[in-house]
């Protein structure tokens, strides 16, 4: 079952979520019919699950469309990336022309700019709602935080990466996040040197971001300590600048 089929699926019982909660194995895509009409209740359910709560105009528009057509629009990430029109997004974060204290004040102001911009992106009505929900999801999965990164430009770059791969290849996203400037700082990649490897990111990548702890059916562990060591060695030398 692919993502598109999943989003088209609808519970088989009239209460909307009952069959899902009861563990029903019926994954047949929802198709409107007389006993299960496409109505305001089902349209609102779809829009809530794929966004942050629909506006009335969105609900009215959805009711005039079909579930399949709405899902096609929601999964279309072919449009241009939204840009944050602030000069600081392309400034050198390590520009020494200003005093460190002044530069830190800039970072604080820029962080507020970034937060407001991102929240506004989530609130924009229309087909980008699901993409923005996925950006939030990936930020919670490949977690980092400004309190350690301290460079607003890098948080902005990471936010754009999650948006680019909102519906893309998980493998490629994992590859990209491994050298993402914010992640390199957050999980100590900048201190990962050939002469003294730092295994923090390698361990997090395998344990939390991808494979997880446990074993396969044949008893083989998902990864070994040696895998962590070798991955850490493979990622030595990366800095926030590349």
Task: Give short role names for the model-derived ranges.
Residues 5-113, 122-124, 129, 222, ...:
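N-terminal module-boundary/linker segments of secreted carbohydrate-active enzymes
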Residues 54-72, 106-242:
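Primarily short, surface-exposed interaction patches in extracytoplasmic proteins
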């Amino acid at each position: 079952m692919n993502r598109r089929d999943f989003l088209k699926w609808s519970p088989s019982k009239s209460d909307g979520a009952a069959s899902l909660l009861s563990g029903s194995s019926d994954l047949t895509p929802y198709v409107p019919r007389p006993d299960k009409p496409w109505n305001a209740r089902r349209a609102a359910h779809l829009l809530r699950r794929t966004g942050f709560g629909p506006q009335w105009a969105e609900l009215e528009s959805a009711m005039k469309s079909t579930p399949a057509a709405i899902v096609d629009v929601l999964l279309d990430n072919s449009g241009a990336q939204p840009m944050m029109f602030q000069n600081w997004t392309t400034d050198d974060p390590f520009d020494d022309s200003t005093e460190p204290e002044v530069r830190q004040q800039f970072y604080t102001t820029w962080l507020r700019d970034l937060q407001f911009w991102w929240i506004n992106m989530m609130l924009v009505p229309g087909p980008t709602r699901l993409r923005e929900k996925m950006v939030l999801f990936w930020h919670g999965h490949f977690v980092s935080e400004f309190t350690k990164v301290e460079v607003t430009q890098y948080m902005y770059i990471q936010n754009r990466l999650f948006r680019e791969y909102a519906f893309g290849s998980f493998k490629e996203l994992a590859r990209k996040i491994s050298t993402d400037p914010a992640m390199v700082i957050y999980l100590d990649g900048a201190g990962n040197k050939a002469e003294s490897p730092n295994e923090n990111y390698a361990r997090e990548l395998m344990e939390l971001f991808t494979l997880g702890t446990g074993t396969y059916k044949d008893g083989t562990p998902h990864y070994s300590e040696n895998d962590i060591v070798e991955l850490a060695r493979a990622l030595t030398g990366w800095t926030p600048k590349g």
